[in-house]
């Protein structure tokens, strides 16, 4: 062999690395090519030097140096010569394989420390080590046996270790299979031991969770190579627990391994279902750039399988090689090699395009782009994203650059309910701009889309994305876009809502909920949408497509809903049609206030849920609000609720984008609001008109008149069906964009405020329920929408718009607001409107239960058909449709909203409205108190019937949130205390209305739509630490309105109220002080008066401060007590006494109604509402009536000073004092009185100055008393009582200006008390207040008329002057005594109640503490028990594992012992025992040799002796001859 000097330096390089730690020479040596005939001489110490160097570097974990050493030894191994012998053989004898085992173990430790992370250096090191093993394996049979015996078990253990990276496992399993392929037959016995059987079983389990198809194949191949076919039949059931898998494994044949293994692994992976980590899909064709890759030529290979490996994050498949035998060639595409990929549908095929970072060579073909075609039905998107990541998805990147289609699309509905897109440009030029804005907002909406939408439409998503990218303006009607049945809406996963197929099957359709956004939202929406687009980022492209679809859909849906609603008016959803039409109609609608009113509760909920993501915006058009704005707003609110629900989900998915969008929306809102103002004015007028219309429809009378009303509405409905249809079609898109934008703005505003609203979460839940119902309703709407579409005509729309404008102009003036409001109230009262239903509506809206039937709700609200529908107003438990009151109030609110919008109603009214808005919109911004506050949802008459959500959702979402918030209560408290509204605003905004003024404005807009309430909204709900249910609070407000109108006004109370109303905010406190002074003058005992005032304050404050009376539970208990006590008191008291409370309440109500809700003091407003609600509520309240009746009869006392009307009223009601069932009389009283509210108000105002101070005192006391009584009654009677409760609030506030100060004190005290205590205290206060007021009334009334004196005491001579003195003195003393007694009674009662409360509180606390302690102990012991149980389980497991290890070790020991004995026996037999045969042969052979040797020696001896004798003879002869010659010579 030739010797190359450069390669002779191998050992020297090893020495340098070992001694000098210099690996450069060694790495340089590796670059030299080595020929087979080159011989490298090394010393005997070379092996030890290599071992020491590798061990050192492994300990240092210097992977690169270890690889260099292993590569050098592996490459030069066959050329190394040690002392003239083969180097590897010599090193094997020196223990190379045993040393390599140690190297492998140390390398294994390094691998395990790396975890599953992929490290190229470690992977290369393991490959180099295994390559060296292969070199040694091929040297000799001895080397093969040692390598297999030592390394196969270790490699198997490394393969089944889940902590090792899959790539490493793939490499070593391949090398192990290469070893096993060359393994000699006798070496199989080595693999039949128990240890290998256990490892094989573990390898079988590893197949299930390998996560890579190549690894699975390698494991199956190893199992097949380590066992014979017969052994596999026996061991398969041990390896696989499931029989069908074991049988499939048995069917694998060595001759058909590739195909059989494919069948087996496809079965295994398919069986795993969602848990599988290898997804295999059949590929139709594969291309590398332009070159097609061929499927392996195998008859059994049915499909061109592509494997998506989640574990290794690779895509792999096999192709036919270019060699002659067409062997299989594996192609693997790892994630790190992919630059970008895309998935799209082309010609009913799904194309996966993978662009690689570098050019690759596959089967002699080079390329950089891999194209894989799949069947369109296969879902490969999610799997591909899991492997390559979503960031490399071209769709998300490409869509960012996609231009947004500016063409407005108009939606029509065909007979099947399919939505058809028509270029909006063909319908109205304005639509394009709106659509562009809308599309901008769509991107965020798209992100907001729930994932459920996204998944189902993945297939159509690509097509739709392409279509929508271009959004052809010439889109044909046959090209239906985004159609999904309502039932499928919420089950869909994918965001793609549209499918390009013409009228796709309904099961594939998705109809997004209607988007109820007012036109006022336009600008802000566009801005918001733009911001959202920015936030979209990489997802933008997808979202943009979805946005386009969704926006169009939203528009279409809005239109469709509106149209369908109109048609359904007489069918399923009598009331809803109109409202939705109104929502869809013109931008001129009262969008601003309604905007937020529509979504007040919904928006609050949305905000509370932080659903202000794009979804809220994409609700279909709310434009059709003209006719039934309230209803429309309700429907819109409901729709928004649906959207909100969806948004909620979306928001969760894409909270970041939604949040940023929300911020952008906030900014856009400001700009947008400016633009909205123009539309708002017009819209408000329209809203009012619609409200009136709706009110008529919704009146209790309307329930009976629904058919008649339908005829009336037919003006709207007919026009709406036709013109509205056309409007919807033409304007729907524009308005949907605008309204959506508005909605987004309002939503953002509400979100800011609603997040603070505690009831928001509840509303969200209700939204979800509503969604389910809505889906079913949508289906019915689809068919109806087609009819509407056919009827749509632009000309009819114009007519309708003109009529709307004319009606708007009539009611658009601010001065008309109050009157219209009063008229609405009166009409409501006359119609016998059921307060309870209205309250329920608002409540449900607040709770978002309306969501369950948002669309249906819309229909019901607008439609007038008396269908016995779940959503029918009449079904609320009252004959009167719930919507009536809300609608009327809504109309009034709209009017007020108009006035407020420009002027913000005069101080007192504004203040009232502000307060009401605080109640109504606890979560909304107070900036626009007047607008927002004109009407509160609480005014909708809940009758404590929270469960009745069917109607509440029908109504416009009331501007007021569901529950009174603590923050709201604080605000209310401020109002009561007589502080300026500014202070209230500060308080409320800080707590709930922290959002910007823009938000407040938006909220204001929404309020009108929701249902604008009259001064009722201004009513200050009494603060209660425990918020009433939505139904309760709303009932109170609404009932208070009607009551105010119906109750006669007492002059003195009116006077105080008028002052309160007229006085500026700052003057309220002064006014309160003045009233107190007057009282003190009238009551000559100032100290008693103060005490009484304090008491009253304490009594009244809790309720007045709490937006609602004390909690239901507490109040009911109170009611029982108070009713008994009060009833007794009334019985004992003369009729003259009872009239006072009623008169006062009536006066307060009249003053409120007369002022038109301008009451300035929020406190007074709430009280007045409560009082008014009791007497006025059209709904009978048996428990409550006895008190009402006395109140009515009280008007008799003031006959002289009160108008004849009042006399008539009192006379009418005088007999109902003790009649618990005086519902009819009370109702008549309200009916008679309501029309004359203004008249009463004027009379009371005139007579105000004439009222005696004593009368005023008594009236005030009565008001207080009445206030307390109604509150109790309200709770007692239930929902109805709740309604009246609000009115009670109103009356008290109006009647008692003095109580302003008193309530301030009371409020302070109430705030300090816990919820429960406060409620109890409230009840107590009411009770003793009633008794006190009753007694005061009795003293005031106790007087003998002059006529009676003359007739009955004719015998006593007395002048009239003397009579007056005696009478006055008697009254004075009576009053003083009464005050003293009442004070004593009050204090005693308070003391007793305080002690009782303390005792109860302490006992409860102690019990609760004990229970908590016991619970804590139980929980702790349970935890300890669980820990102990777990420890026992662990111990048992460890014991089992330990026993198995012991068994294994014992088995190994037994086997080694047997081998040892055998070896000893054999050695003994060979070494110890003698073998004569062998010795004999040796002896024989040796003897023969000896004989031969002896013979040779003998012969040699004889020869020597003969030669010696002959020599002697010769010598003697010579001597003889010589002697003879001498002699001769001689």
UniProtKB/Swiss-Prot annotation:
Biased composition (Basic residues): 970-979
Primary subcellular site in the record, as a coarse category: nucleus
Keywords assigned: Cell cycle, Cell division, Chromosome, DNA-binding, Meiosis, Nucleus, Phosphoprotein
Record region (Disordered): 439-480, 496-555, 653-676, 693-717, 755-795, 962-1003
Record's signal peptide: none
Phosphothreonine modification, residue list: 471, 619, 938, 1189, 1339
Residue stretches spanning the membrane: none
Residue numbers bearing the Phosphoserine modification: 457, 465, 494, 519, 529, 538, 660, 664, 936, 1136, 1138, 1145, 1161, 1177, 1204, 1234, 1253, 1295, 1297
Domain of life: Eukaryota
Gene Ontology cellular-component annotations: condensed chromosome, centromeric region; lateral element; nucleus; synaptonemal complex
Post-translational modification: Phosphorylated.
GO biological process, one term: apoptotic process
Basic and acidic residues composition-biased segments: 439-461, 542-555
Amino acid composition bias (Polar residues), ranges on this chain: 515-530, 695-713, 755-764, 988-998
Subunit structure and binding partners: Component of the lateral elements of synaptonemal complexes. Heterodimer with SYCP3. Interacts with SMC1A and SMC3. Interacts with TEX11.
Function: Major component of the axial/lateral elements of synaptonemal complexes (SCS) during meiotic prophase. Plays a role in the assembly of synaptonemal complexes. Required for normal meiotic chromosome synapsis during oocyte and spermatocyte development and for normal male and female fertility. Required for insertion of SYCP3 into synaptonemal complexes. May be involved in the organization of chromatin by temporarily binding to DNA scaffold attachment regions. Requires SYCP3, but not SYCP1, in order to be incorporated into the axial/lateral elements.
Clinical disorder: Spermatogenic failure 1: An infertility disorder characterized by azoospermia due to spermatogenic arrest during meiosis. Meiotic arrest is characterized by germ cells that enter meiosis and undergo the first chromosomal reduction from 4n to 2n, but that are then unable to proceed further. This results in tubules containing spermatocytes as the latest developmental stage of germ cells. Meiotically arrested spermatocytes accumulate in the tubules and degenerate. Both autosomal recessive and autosomal dominant inheritance have been reported.
Family according to the record: Belongs to the SYCP2 family.
PANTHER family membership: SYNAPTONEMAL COMPLEX PROTEIN 2, SYNAPTONEMAL COMPLEX PROTEIN-RELATED
Entry protein name: Synaptonemal complex protein 2
Organism: Homo sapiens (Human)
Lineage, broadest ranks: Eukaryota, Metazoa, Chordata, Craniata, Vertebrata
């Amino acid at each position: 062999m030739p010797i190359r000097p450069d390669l002779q330096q191998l050992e020297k390089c090893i020495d340098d690395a070992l001694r000098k730690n210099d690996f450069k020479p060694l790495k340089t040596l590796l670059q030299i090519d080595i020929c087979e005939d080159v011989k490298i001489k090394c010393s005997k110490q070379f092996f030890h030097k290599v071992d020491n160097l590798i061990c050192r570097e492994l300990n240092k974990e210097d992977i690169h140096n270890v690889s260099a050493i292993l590569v050098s030894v592996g490459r030069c191994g066959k050329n190394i010569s040690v002392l003239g012998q083969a180097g590897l053989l010599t090193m094997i004898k020196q223990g190379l394989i045993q040393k390599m085992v140690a190297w492998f173990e140390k390398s294994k430790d390094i691998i395990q420390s790396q975890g599953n992370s992929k490290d190229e250096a470690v992977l290369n090191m393991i490959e180099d080590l295994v390559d060296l093993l292969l070199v040694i394996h091929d040297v000799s049979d001895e080397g093969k046996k040692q390598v297999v015996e030592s390394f196969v078990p270790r490699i198997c253990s490394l393969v089944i270790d889940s902590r090792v990276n899959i790539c490493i496992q793939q490499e070593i399993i391949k090398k192990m299979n290469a070893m096993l392929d060359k393994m000699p037959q006798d070496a199989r016995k080595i693999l039949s031991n128990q240890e290998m059987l256990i490892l094989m079983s573990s390898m079988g389990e590893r197949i299930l969770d390998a996560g890579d198809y190549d690894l699975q194949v390698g494991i199956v191949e190893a199992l097949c190579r380590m066992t014979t076919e017969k052994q596999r039949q026996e061991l398969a059931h041990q390896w696989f627990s499931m029989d069908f898998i074991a049988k499939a494994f048995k069917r694998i044949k060595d001759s058909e391994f590739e195909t059989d293994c494919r069948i087996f692994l496809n079965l295994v992976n398919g069986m795993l279902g969602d848990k599988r980590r290898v997804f295999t899909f059949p590929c139709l064709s594969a291309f590398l750039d332009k070159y097609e890759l061929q499927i392996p030529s195998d008859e059994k290979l049915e499909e061109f399988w592509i494997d998506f490996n989640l574990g290794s994050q690779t895509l792999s498949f096999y192709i036919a090689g270019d060699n002659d035998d067409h062997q299989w060639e594996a192609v693997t595409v790892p994630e790190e090699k992919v630059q970008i990929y895309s998935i799209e549908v082309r010609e009913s095929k799904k194309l996966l395009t993978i662009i690689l970072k570098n050019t690759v060579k596959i089967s002699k073909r080079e390329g950089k782009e891999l194209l894989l075609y799949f069947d369109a039905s296969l879902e490969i998107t999610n799997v591909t994203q899991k492997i390559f990541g979503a960031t490399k998805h071209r769709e998300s990147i490409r869509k960012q650059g996609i231009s947004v289609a500016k063409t407005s699309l108009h939606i029509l509905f065909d007979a099947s309910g399919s939505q058809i897109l028509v270029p909006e440009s063909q319908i109205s030029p304005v639509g394009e701009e709106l659509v562009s804005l809308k599309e901008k907002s769509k991107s965020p909406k798209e992100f907001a889309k729930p994932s459920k939408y996204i998944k189902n439409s993945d297939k159509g998503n690509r097509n739709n994305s392409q279509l929508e990218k271009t959004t052809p303006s010439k889109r044909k009607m046959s090209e239906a876009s985004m159609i999904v049945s309502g039932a499928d809406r919420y089950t869909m996963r994918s965001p793609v809502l549209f499918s390009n197929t013409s009228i796709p099957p309904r099961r594939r359709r998705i109809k997004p909920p209607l988007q109820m956004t007012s036109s006022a939202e336009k600008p802000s929406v566009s801005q918001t949408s733009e911001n959202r687009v920015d936030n979209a980022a990489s997802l933008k492209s997808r979202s943009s497509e979805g946005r386009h679809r969704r926006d169009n859909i939203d528009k279409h849906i809005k239109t469709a809903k509106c149209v369908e609603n109109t048609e359904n008016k007489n069918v399923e959803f009598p009331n809803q049609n109109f409202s939705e039409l109104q929502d869809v109609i013109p931008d001129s609608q009262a969008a601003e206030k309604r905007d937020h009113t529509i979504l007040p509760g919904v928006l609050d909920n949305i905000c509370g849920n932080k659903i202000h993501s794009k979804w809220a915006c994409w609700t279909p058009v709310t434009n059709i609000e003209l006719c039934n704005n309230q209803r429309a707003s309700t429907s819109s609110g409901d729709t928004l609720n649906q959207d909100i629900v969806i948004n909620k989900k979306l928001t969760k998915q894409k909270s970041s984008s939604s949040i940023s969008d929300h911020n952008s929306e906030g900014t856009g809102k400001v700009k947008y609001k400016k633009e909205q103002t123009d539309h708002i004015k017009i819209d408000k007028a329209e809203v009012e008109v619609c409200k009136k219309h709706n009110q008529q429809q919704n009146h209790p009378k309307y329930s009976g008149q629904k058919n008649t009303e339908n005829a009336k509405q037919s003006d709207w409905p007919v026009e709406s069906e036709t013109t509205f249809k056309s409007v919807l079609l033409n304007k729907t898109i524009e308005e949907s964009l605008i309204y959506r934008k508005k909605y987004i703005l309002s939503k953002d505003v509400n979100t800011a405020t609603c997040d603070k609203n505690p009831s928001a979460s509840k509303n969200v839940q209700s939204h979800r329920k509503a969604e389910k119902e809505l889906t079913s309703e949508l289906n019915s709407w689809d068919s109806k929408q087609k009819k509407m579409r056919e009827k749509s005509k632009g000309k009819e729309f114009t007519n309708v718009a003109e009529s709307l404008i004319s009606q708007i102009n009539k009611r658009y003036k601010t001065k008309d607001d109050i009157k219209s409001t009063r008229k609405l109230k009166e009409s409501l009262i006359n119609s016998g409107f059921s307060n309870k239903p209205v309250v329920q509506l608002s409540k449900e809206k607040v709770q978002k239960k309306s969501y369950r039937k948002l669309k249906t709700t819309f229909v019901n609200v607008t439609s007038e058909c008396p269908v016995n529908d779940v959503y029918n107003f009449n079904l609320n438990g009252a004959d009167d449709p719930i919507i009536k009151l809300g609608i009327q109030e809504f109309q009034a609110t709209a009017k007020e909203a108009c006035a407020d919008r420009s002027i913000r109603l005069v101080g007192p009214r504004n203040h009232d409205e502000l307060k009401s808005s605080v109640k109504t919109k606890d979560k909304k911004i107070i900036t626009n108190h007047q607008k927002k506050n004109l009407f509160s949802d609480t005014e909708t008459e809940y009758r404590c019937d929270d469960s009745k959500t069917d109607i509440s959702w029908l109504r416009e979402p009331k501007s007021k949130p569901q529950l009174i918030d603590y923050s709201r209560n604080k605000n209310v408290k401020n109002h009561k205390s007589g502080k300026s509204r500014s202070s209230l605003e500060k308080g409320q905004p800080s707590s709930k209305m922290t959002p910007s003024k823009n938000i407040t404005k938006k909220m204001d807009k929404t309020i009108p739509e929701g249902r604008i309430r009259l001064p009722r909204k201004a009513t200050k709900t009494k603060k209660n630490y425990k918020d009433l249910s939505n139904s309760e609070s709303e009932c109170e407000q609404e009932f208070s309105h009607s009551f105010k109108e119906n109750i006669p006004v007492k002059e003195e109370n009116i006077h105080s109220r008028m002052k309160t109303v007229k006085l500026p905010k700052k003057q309220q406190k002064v006014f309160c002080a003045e009233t107190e002074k007057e009282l003190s003058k009238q009551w000559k005992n100032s100290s008693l008066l103060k005490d009484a005032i304090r008491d009253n304050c304490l009594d009244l404050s809790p309720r007045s401060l709490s937006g609602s009376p004390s909690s239901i539970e507490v109040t009911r208990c109170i009611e029982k007590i108070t009713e008994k006590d009060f009833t007794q008191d009334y019985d004992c008291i003369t009729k003259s006494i009872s009239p006072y409370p009623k008169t006062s309440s009536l006066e307060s109500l009249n003053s409120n109604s007369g002022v038109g809700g301008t009451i300035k003091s929020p406190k007074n407003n709430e009280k007045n509402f409560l009082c008014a609600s009791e007497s006025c509520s059209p709904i009978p309240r048996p428990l409550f009536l006895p008190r009402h009746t006395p109140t009515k009869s009280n008007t008799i006392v003031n006959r002289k000073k009160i108008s004849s009307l009042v006399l008539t009223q009192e006379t009418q009601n005088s007999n109902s004092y003790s009649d618990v069932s005086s519902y009819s009389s009370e109702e008549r009283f309200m009916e008679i009185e309501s029309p004359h509210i203004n008249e009463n108000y004027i009379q009371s105002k005139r007579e105000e100055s004439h009222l005696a101070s004593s009368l005023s005192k008594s009236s005030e006391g009565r008001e207080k008393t009445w206030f307390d009584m109604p509150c109790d009654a309200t709770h007692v009677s239930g929902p109805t009582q709740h309604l009246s409760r609000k009115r009670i609030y109103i009356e008290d506030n109006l009647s008692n200006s003095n109580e302003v100060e008193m309530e301030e004190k009371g409020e302070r005290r109430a705030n300090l008390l816990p919820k429960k205590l406060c409620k109890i205290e409230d009840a107590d206060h009411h009770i003793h207040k009633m008794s006190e007021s009753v007694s005061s009334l009795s003293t005031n009334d106790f007087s003998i008329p002059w006529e009676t004196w003359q007739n009955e005491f004719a015998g006593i001579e007395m002048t009239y002057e003397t009579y007056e003195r005696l009478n006055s003195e008697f009254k004075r003393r009576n009053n003083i005594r009464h005050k003293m007694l009442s004070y004593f009674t009050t204090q005693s009662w308070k003391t007793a109640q305080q002690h009782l409360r303390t005792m109860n509180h302490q006992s409860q606390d102690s019990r609760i503490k004990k229970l908590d302690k016991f619970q804590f102990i139980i929980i702790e012991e349970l935890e300890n028990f669980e820990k102990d149980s777990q420890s026992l389980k662990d111990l048992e497991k460890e014991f089992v594992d330990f026993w198995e290890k012991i068994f294994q070790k014992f088995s190994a020991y037994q086997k080694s012992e047997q081998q040892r004995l055998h070896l000893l026996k054999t050695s003994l037999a060979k070494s110890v025992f003698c073998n004569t045969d062998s010795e004999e042969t040796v002896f024989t052979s040796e003897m023969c040799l000896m004989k031969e040797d002896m013979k040779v020696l003998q012969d040699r001896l004889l020869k020597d002796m003969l030669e010696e004798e002959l020599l002697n003879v010769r010598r003697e002869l010579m001597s003889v001859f010589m002697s003879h010659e001498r002699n001769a010579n001689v």
